[in-house]
Structure formats: C-alpha cells, structure tokens
Amino acid sequence: MFGVGIDIIEIDRIRKSYQTYGDRFLKKIFTEGERVYCFSKSNPYASLAARFAAKEAVAKALGTGIGKLLKWKEIEMCRDSRQPQVVVPEALLCSLGVKRVLLSVSHSREYATAVAIAE
C-alpha cells in the first residue's frame, strides 16, 4: 500500500460556496461530467460534497495535496457501476509508483465523507 486519505465535509459548506460564487466555484473544482451528474440528482449538494471529499482524500492518499502536482479537476469521480471510480493523471500515478486508487464515499443529511487507498 502506498497511502491512505480520508476527508469529511459539511454539505452546507458546498451549498453556501455555490450560492456565494456560483458557476465560478463549480468550474474551478468539478469536471463537466461531475457537474452534470450532481445536478441530475435530487440533492446536488450532497453529491458535490461527496466528490469534494473524494478529491481531498485522493490527494492525501497520494501525498501530493491539491496544488502544483495535482489540480482539482485532474481528479474525477465517475460512476460506471455501483462502486465509485476515480480518474487521476496516469503520468502522476506512474511517477509515484501507484498502480491504482480505490475509493469509498458516503453522505448523510449533513456530511459527506470519502476514503481513498493508493496502492
């Protein structure tokens, strides 16, 4: 195993950020596919918060954080099945010696959380 990352966020924090900054906030953090998926849900803020937590957890598991080596939109959470999949630049994974990143996300009424394992 290379690393483990975990994150938790209040869903209301994402809602307030969207209400304050609008599309500018969304376009900085989330890919177009993530935005479309989340706003197709009855509670888009819970889905957005889960993806935000996932991005943070992945960055922690890789040990890069969000910044120079890894940008927000370079981490994309996809749902091809019931299990969430995460897409990260292959070149970065290779440079770190990471073969894959596993992801688990969940949310309640108030919080979203994610755990990522890089191996």
Curated annotation (Swiss-Prot):
Query: Record keywords: Protein biosynthesis included?
Result: no
Tell me which Gene3D superfamilies the record gives. Answer: 4'-phosphopantetheinyl transferase domain
Cofactor(s) for this UniProt protein = Mg(2+)
User: What is the catalytic activity of this protein?
Assistant: apo-[ACP] + CoA = holo-[ACP] + adenosine 3',5'-bisphosphate + H(+)
| HAMAP family assigned | AcpS
Q: What is this protein called?
A: Holo-[acyl-carrier-protein] synthase
GO CC list: cytoplasm
- Give the location in the cell: Cytoplasm
> Which positions does UniProt annotate for Mg(2+) binding?
7, 56
> What NCBIfam families has UniProt attached to this entry?
acpS, pantethn_trn
Report the record's Gene Ontology biological process terms: fatty acid biosynthetic process
Q: What are its E.C. numbers?
A: 2.7.8.7
Family, similarity comment = Belongs to the P-Pant transferase superfamily. AcpS family.
GO molecular function terms listed in the Swiss-Prot or TrEMBL record: holo-[acyl-carrier-protein] synthase activity; magnesium ion binding
Disulfide bond annotation, renumbered to this chain: none
The UniProt keyword set, sorted, is:
Cytoplasm, Fatty acid biosynthesis, Fatty acid metabolism, Lipid biosynthesis, Lipid metabolism, Magnesium, Metal-binding, Transferase
The record's annotation in Pfam families points to: ACPS
**Record InterPro entries:** 4-PPantetheinyl_Trfase_dom, 4-PPantetheinyl_Trfase_dom_sf, ACPS, Ppantetheine-prot_Trfase_dom
* Record's function text: Transfers the 4'-phosphopantetheine moiety from coenzyme A to a Ser of acyl-carrier-protein.
Give the matching SUPFAM superfamilies. 4'-phosphopantetheinyl transferase
